[in-house]
Amino acid sequence: MADSPGCCSIWARCLHCLYSCHWRKYPKQKMQTSKCDCIWFGLLFLTFLLSLGWLYIGLILLNDLHNFNEFLFRHWGHWMDWSLIVLLVVSLLVTYASLLLLLGLLLQLCGQPLHLHSLHKVLLLLIVLLVAAGLVGLDIQWRQEWHSLRLSLQATAPFLHIGAVAGITLLAWPVADTFYRIHPRGPKVLLLLLFFGVTLVIYLMPLLFISSPCIMKLRDLPPKPGLVGHRGAPMLAPENTLMSLRKTAECGAAVFETDVMVSSDGVPFLMHDERLSRTTNVASVFPERISAHSSDFSWAELQRLNAGTWFLERQPFWGAKKLSGSDRKEAENQTIPALEELLKEAAALNLSIMFDLRRPPRNHTYYDTFVNQTLEAVLSANVSQAMVLWLPDEDRANVQQRAPRMRQIYGHQGGNWTERPQFLNLPYQDLPALDIKALHQDNISVNLFVVNKPWLFSLLWCAGVDSVTTNACQLLQQMQNPLWLLPPQKYLMIWVITDCASILLLLSIFLLRGGCAKRNRTGLETAVLLTKINNFASE
């Protein structure tokens, strides 16, 4: 890359010291960058891109990181919110790779050798291995998150494109400098083709790859999706409690989504986990049964448990607002609600109820009749059947026969439907496979889960989704418009202006650097000629 001593100022020496960890000045024969150094610089650039990509992945996965936290708790038995840790580690990796890459580019511009120190080489390899391990782990354990990442590009691609254009434009100066420094024609042509090939692809990205439902006119924007509280309002109150039910109503949500199990004596109650240890004080009340299945406890035993103190000891969501004094006192006194009790409270708050029904263990008394036990509890509550959104597929035909006014919710598209569905409840990753307009024409409403971040809510809003299940109803309630909305003509104008400005800057940089290189060659030839004249005169 560099083939001349270049500037030997203190500034350049400091940069070289940080990059190579050597303060001493190199002799002339060592002032050149070897092929090995070029390979390491390429690895540095690759590491920067990998760490930047991993930062993007981390930011997108924050929407689903509560699943990761619960997964680790089930396997390790210790609760920790990994949001801050993930962001901190990835930010450090990106910062280190960015600073090292910046040092390398500045050294190249100063004509200094790119002798990367062994410590930096080891750290770069560790970063590559760490990112690779993260990607492999993501692919093995949470493969559905790749669908989340692809979906996120519909929300971020227009802005990533502008960032990519800015980045390739800034990269033009060191590329032009390298182009005019190297002499063999082959490497010069290869460098030029590679750089301008990548540049052309970036310029044409909106035409080739970018599409988003939020590129639309304001008048075409669908109505704001309704909100479904995921286990209630778990950022404001302990999940699956009556306090969480009340907070859901205060958020303006229309539906309370919960999970139902059947106790050992046949009482349906609210609980998500197969073990009670995460959301109750079972460890202190029944220490010998801490690993027992939630359905193995009788209703009398479940009533002895506290379902709120854990929420005050370890807030499950990073960044959630602290509770006021009255809310803290209410949370401390929460217990596990029975389904019948919940239905009566929901009716008073004008909330609908949607729930997952979890089958008890095989040796359970109600293993075969848990659906009937749950249905009996619903009917015994003497509430409107229309307020219950029935999601379980088990014995659905019998449920419809006994409770015909109950709304049937399907958790899949197609399949063995017992009637024409009116509601679909699907993961948000299924959005690309859905034809929302066609479903609406068939009078089918679509609810997608679990949506916590404004960027994702905005995307689903633009796509015309009817409602979303969320942990952050208090946040999404405040949104009056999507985060961004661009009319097609305006986006086209931004795209053209951005590309044209970049093209002008690229041409200017290459012309300017070419002029500098020409003057340097002329000056060098003049100096050589004067030296020969002086030598001839001295003879």
UniProtKB/Swiss-Prot annotation:
One of its GO terms (biological process) is actin filament organization. Its cofactor is Ca(2+). It holds the Pfam family GDPD. A divalent metal cation binds at residues 257, 259, 272. One of its GO terms (cellular component) is cytoplasm. InterPro entries: GP_PDE_dom, PLC-like_Pdiesterase_TIM-brl. GO terms for molecular function: glycerophosphoinositol inositolphosphodiesterase activity; metal ion binding. The chain crosses the membrane at residues 41-61, 84-104, 122-142, 155-175, 190-210, 492-512. Its EC number is 3.1.4.43. Belongs to the glycerophosphoryl diester phosphodiesterase family. Has glycerophosphoinositol inositolphosphodiesterase activity and specifically hydrolyzes glycerophosphoinositol, with no activity for other substrates such as glycerophosphoinositol 4-phosphate, glycerophosphocholine, glycerophosphoethanolamine, and glycerophosphoserine. Accelerates the program of osteoblast differentiation and growth. May play a role in remodeling of the actin cytoskeleton. This is Glycerophosphoinositol inositolphosphodiesterase GDPD2. The lineage of its organism: Eukaryota, Metazoa, Chordata, Craniata, Vertebrata. The gene is Gdpd2.
